[in-house]
Structure formats: structure tokens, C-alpha cells
């Protein structure tokens, strides 16, 4: 029974895998942008109230993302409203994803990664 289930899961995985061909078409969004369009990178995290954990995880990931996309405006948002509220009492302001998207739209960004 376990072998059959494992075989089925493997077949589904192979069938659904993205690859260059079939249903997947590689494209460079930034290369296809028209004059006047702007792109930004929005990193969304659950969040943490622990400063040391944030430095070792979220800030490290954000630094790698900034390095990978140096030409894009960088923003971050947290999904946990509890974390956002607790950080705000300590003077650390984080946006929700909706707030970040609305702010980017207000600033004229047309493409968000």
C-alpha cells in the first residue's frame, strides 16, 4: 500500500513539475516593461518580535533578495497583525501586505515581484 501511494505521489509530482516546455513559458518581466512602468520587489514574511531571530532570518533573506535584484525598489511586509502591533509599541513599523501594495501603487509602481 505504501509503495502504491509513494508511486502515485511521485507520478503526480513529475506530471506537475514546472519546466521549460509544456505549460511553462519562461519570460523576463523586467525586459518587457514599457517606458514609464516601474517595478518593485515586495518580500512578505509572517514576522517575529525577536530582534536576534529577525536579524538572522528575515533580514538575511531580505539582504539576499536585494543583492539578487539591485535595480528594483525593495519593500517588506508582515502578515501577522499581532507581530505588527507588538513591534509598533517598540517603535518598529512594518506594513501589512495590503498596505505595502497600496503604497507601491500610490507611488506609481506597475509591476510587483
Predicted segments with their positions:
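Positively charged n-region of N-terminal signal peptides that target proteins for export
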Residues: 1-7
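Active-site-proximal alpha-helix that buttresses catalytic centers in soluble enzyme cores
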Residues: 18-113
Amino acid at each position: 500500500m505504501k509503495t502504491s501511494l509513494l508511486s502515485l505521489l511521485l507520478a503526480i509530482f513529475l506530471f506537475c513539475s514546472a519546466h521549460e516546455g509544456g505549460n511553462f513559458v519562461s519570460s523576463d518581466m523586467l525586459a518587457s516593461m514599457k517606458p514609464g512602468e516601474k517595478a518593485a520587489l515586495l518580500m512578505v514574511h509572517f514576522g517575529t518580535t525577536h530582534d536576534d531571530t529577525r536579524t538572522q532570518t528575515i533580514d538575511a533573506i531580505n539582504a539576499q533578495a536585494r543583492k539578487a535584484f539591485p535595480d528594483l525598489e525593495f519593500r517588506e511586509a508582515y502578515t501577522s497583525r499581532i507581530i505588527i502591533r507588538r513591534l509598533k509599541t517598540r517603535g518598529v513599523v512594518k506594513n501589512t501586505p495590503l498596505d505595502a501594495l497600496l503604497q507601491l501603487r500610490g507611488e506609481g509602481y506597475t509591476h510587483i515581484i
